[in-house]
């Protein structure tokens, strides 16, 4: 018995490099094979039930030698996609990939019969096949299935990309994610890590006494964030609706209603730009806890993210884009001005307190301080924009930036000690915002006044300013306990945990322009 040299194994057809005419020819040939299968009877049988998966077999029998496998035969039934194939006269090898990994089939004419073996020679890479047989080791020691019964379950009509090059076109990876998942173990591992991270978050929240809830995706009034919404129409109610930009105001209504710890993991939609850090449809986790404040939230969020890293990656010390990222150490905490002076030490305290100086300085960065969003801009807003220009992108290590100005924090509780400042933080890691949280504003009259100021900004042309939500004000008028709330960007968090440079790498089906 011999085993194929893997370097010589028949490669999958290199779709990414094939001219359209060649690919069409391959597809036509495969359609002819499918037509022949239809004439023979059931072309897509659905009566095979696997008893094992590849990874579990390798884990359980990876160290079992051939004498032991012969002494106690292990019968298996396994199915998957044929990724490699080598026909050698009366015996052949095939590498089959299921949802857990790959395993080798050893197929002989004597075991499966003349007709099946002859048919197998014409099966194509990408076909879904099944086998029943026993485990054994080849001469080179590879754990394999000695096939006794072989079937074709699903005919693949399109050739797979070349095994050794995969999908070379990055956009094609996003557009045809199903192919990317077939040929790229790295992609599969990324989304497995995403699932582990989300499971960790849910488990952590449940252990801390939070109740998972679902709130509306269609809102009569967009709220909970400064963003431009997607607009749609509800035919039955004959009214304009908005895809939600954030669930915040509904979750806080639940706090008013007596659910003291709630969280939601779901989609938000913002009709804004696309970039390596932004996708119009993205996943957020928001959580709210009565009788807490932003300091408690920072501690809780830090532990939450650290544990998610451990559960998804096995460690809190990661490598991101070639640089170490240590989530095991205590996260830094800086005010906006402290962060500016850390990375741009030329600015003095006096300059950072001078609005005219800041406006002049921001113009050097190309900031239009006459834009509508600067209508109510105080010194805090100007400091924040300077922070964004000078410091934000340099916050590699996990850092909570605190003390955000009231005028850009319309839902946050004002500080009792520092005028114009709120009890708010944003968490930055690798120069990206990962989380945003604050002690919640529960003063109905103050909230109504802030909404009115937001409406003034919207009327002046600021598309991202908030609307006035009268029902939310009514809810606050019933009384909301002191509360802390936070939102974590799941996609950006998973980017860190999987060393992914682009947000579209961690979204299964990111938005792209239509092919036509």
Curated annotation (Swiss-Prot):
Taxonomic path: Bacteria, Pseudomonadati, Pseudomonadota, Betaproteobacteria, Burkholderiales
Catalysed reaction, written as an equation: tRNA(Lys) + L-lysine + ATP = L-lysyl-tRNA(Lys) + AMP + diphosphate
EC assignment: 6.1.1.6
GO molecular function: ATP binding; lysine-tRNA ligase activity; magnesium ion binding; tRNA binding
Organism from which the protein derives: Cupriavidus pinatubonensis (strain JMP 134 / LMG 1197)
Top-level taxon in the UniProt lineage: Bacteria
A GO BP entry: lysyl-tRNA aminoacylation
GO cellular component, one term: cytosol
Ranges where the record places region Disordered: 1-23
Cofactor note: Binds 3 Mg(2+) ions per subunit.
Record-linked Gene3D superfamilies: Bira Bifunctional Protein, Domain 2 (3.30.930.10), Nucleic acid-binding proteins (2.40.50.140)
Protein name per the record: Lysine--tRNA ligase
Cofactor(s), by name: Mg(2+)
């Amino acid at each position: 018995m011999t085993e194929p040299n893997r370097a010589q194994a028949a490669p999958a057809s290199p779709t990414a490099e094939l001219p359209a005419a060649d690919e069409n020819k391959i597809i036509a040939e495969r359609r002819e094979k499918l037509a022949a299968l239809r004439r023979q009877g059931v072309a897509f049988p659905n009566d095979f039930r696997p008893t094992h998966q590849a990874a579990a077999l390798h884990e359980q029998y990876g160290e079992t030698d051939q004498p032991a496998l012969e002494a106690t035969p292990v019968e298996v039934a396994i199915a998957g996609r044929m990724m490699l194939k080598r026909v050698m006269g009366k015996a052949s090898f095939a590498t089959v990939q299921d949802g857990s990994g790959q395993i080798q089939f050893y197929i002989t004419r004597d075991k499966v019969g003349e007709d099946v073996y002859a048919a197998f020679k014409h099966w194509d890479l990408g076909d879904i096949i099944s086998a029943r047989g026993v485990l054994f080791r080849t001469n080179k020691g590879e754990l394999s299935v000695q096939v006794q019964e072989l079937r074709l379950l699903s005919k693949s009509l399109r050739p797979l990309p070349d095994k050794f090059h995969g999908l070379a076109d990055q956009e094609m990876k996003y557009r045809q994610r199903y192919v990317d998942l077939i040929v790229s173990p790295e992609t599969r591992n990324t989304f497995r890590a995403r699932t582990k991270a989300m499971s960790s978050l849910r488990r952590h929240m449940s252990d801390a006494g939070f109740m998972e809830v679902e709130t509306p995706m269609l809102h009569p009034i967009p709220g909970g964030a400064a963003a431009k919404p997607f607009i749609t129409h509800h035919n039955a109610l004959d009214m304009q609706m908005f895809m939600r930009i954030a669930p915040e105001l509904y979750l806080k209504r639940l706090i008013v209603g007596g659910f003291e710890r709630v969280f939601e993991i779901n989609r938000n939609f913002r009709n804004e730009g696309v970039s390596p850090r932004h996708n119009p449809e993205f996943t957020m986790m928001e959580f709210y806890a009565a009788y807490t404040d932003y300091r408690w939230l920072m501690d809780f969020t830090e532990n939450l993210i650290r544990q998610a890293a451990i559960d998804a990656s096995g460690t809190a010390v990661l490598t991101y884009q070639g640089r170490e990222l240590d989530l095991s150490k205590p996260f830094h905490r800086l005010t906006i001005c402290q962060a500016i002076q850390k990375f741009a030490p030329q600015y003095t305290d006096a300059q950072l307190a001078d609005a005219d100086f800041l406006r002049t300085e921001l113009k050097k960065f190309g900031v239009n301080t006459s834009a509508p969003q600067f209508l109510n801009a105080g010194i805090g807003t100007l400091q924040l924009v300077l922070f964004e220009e000078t410091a934000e992108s340099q916050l590699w290590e996990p850092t909570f930036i605190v003390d955000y100005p009231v005028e850009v924090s319309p839902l946050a509780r004002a500080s009792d000690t520092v005028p114009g400042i709120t009890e708010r933080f944003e968490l930055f890691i690798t120069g990206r915002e990962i989380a945003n949280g604050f002690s919640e504003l529960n003063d109905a009259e103050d909230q109504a006044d802030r909404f009115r100021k937001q409406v003034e900004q919207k009327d002046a042309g600021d598309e991202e300013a908030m609307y006035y939500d009268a029902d939310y004000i009514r809810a606050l008028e019933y009384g909301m306990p002191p509360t802390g709330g936070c939102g974590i960007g799941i996609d950006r968090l998973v980017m860190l945990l999987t060393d992914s440079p682009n947000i579209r790498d961690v979204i299964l089906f990111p938005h792209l322009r239509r092919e036509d």
